[in-house]
């Protein structure tokens, strides 16, 4: 009986200690769960903050890059961009008219002659009459003196200024670039030139432009010395096409693209001819390979030895 009573007391003490330990363990477990939830929330907030900071940093870098290098110009569907596409010659003629009446007073095209326009935008008689309107300093004559004469087809387009110093003095220190190769000299050339000519707008809030400059987001730095030159009805086209800002921009870009690559149509035609000839040669080689040489290659010789 004594032994049984002792055993019962030991069991009661063990059960009592387990009942006391259970709330303590549950308290520690709940505290750990709360700590895990809190640390997860802190990690989520940290990740969110890092993402927002990265996004803001990227936006700042992108804005700074656009301000330094200019806004990326959109892509436009130029008719001469296709593999077998050619220039719009009517647009080239109108673009030359825009260059003469709007651009030639400041920008030169020193690599283009009047004879280059023959068969592209004008007849030979029209080009001769156009060249005769300018005066060219030539010589020396038999007396050793220089003289002036009417222009000829072989003459280059006239220069608006005698030298670079005169050009900078007339344009407030800015030097108008030569336009002969402008669409090849600029990244994304035709799209950039069109976006630049039609992209003038008022500067946004917080941006100040120095006097004598004009805001254009497509120009590196955003400030350009050239004012907006393409305004509706700035020229009167010979063929009656409405001279809107976008139309004049398209035409002058077509003219400048031709000036930079006058051989493009001939190059594309020659490439197509070579591709056609090489395709015929490939078909002929495949024919001989399949029907001629395969027979010889698979031929077997049987040697019959007579005893």
Swiss-Prot record:
Q: Where are the transmembrane segments?
A: 271-288
Cell compartments where the protein resides: Mitochondrion inner membrane
Any one Gene Ontology MF annotation carried by this entry is:
heme binding
Q: What is its main location?
A: mitochondrion
Q: Where does heme c bind?
A: 103, 106-107, 226
Entry membrane topology: Single-pass membrane protein
Which residues form the organelle targeting sequence per the record? 1-64
Mapped to this chain, the residue ranges on the Mitochondrial matrix side of the membrane are 289-307
**Matching InterPro entries:** Cyt_c-like_dom, Cyt_c-like_dom_sf, Cyt_c1, Cyt_c1_TM_anchor_C
Mitochondrial intermembrane topological domain residue ranges = 65-270
Listed under GO cellular component are:
cytosol; mitochondrial inner membrane; mitochondrion; plant-type vacuole; vacuole
Q: Which residues form the Cytochrome c domain?
A: 90-246
Q: How is it modified after translation?
A: Binds 1 heme c group covalently per subunit.
Give the UniProt keywords, A-Z: Electron transport, Heme, Iron, Membrane, Metal-binding, Mitochondrion, Mitochondrion inner membrane, Respiratory chain, Transit peptide, Transmembrane, Transmembrane helix, Transport
Sequence similarity: Belongs to the cytochrome c family.
Function in brief: Component of the ubiquinol-cytochrome c oxidoreductase, a multisubunit transmembrane complex that is part of the mitochondrial electron transport chain which drives oxidative phosphorylation.
Describe the subunit structure: Component of the ubiquinol-cytochrome c oxidoreductase (cytochrome b-c1 complex, complex III, CIII), a multisubunit enzyme composed of 10 subunits. The complex is composed of 3 respiratory subunits cytochrome b (MT-CYB), cytochrome c1 (CYC1-1 or CYC1-2) and Rieske protein (UCR1-1 or UCR1-2), 2 core protein subunits MPPalpha1 (or MPPalpha2) and MPPB, and 5 low-molecular weight protein subunits QCR7-1 (or QCR7-2), UCRQ-1 (or UCRQ-2), QCR9, UCRY and probably QCR6-1 (or QCR6-2).
The protein in question is named Cytochrome c1 1, heme protein, mitochondrial
Q: Which organism is it from?
A: Arabidopsis thaliana (Mouse-ear cress)
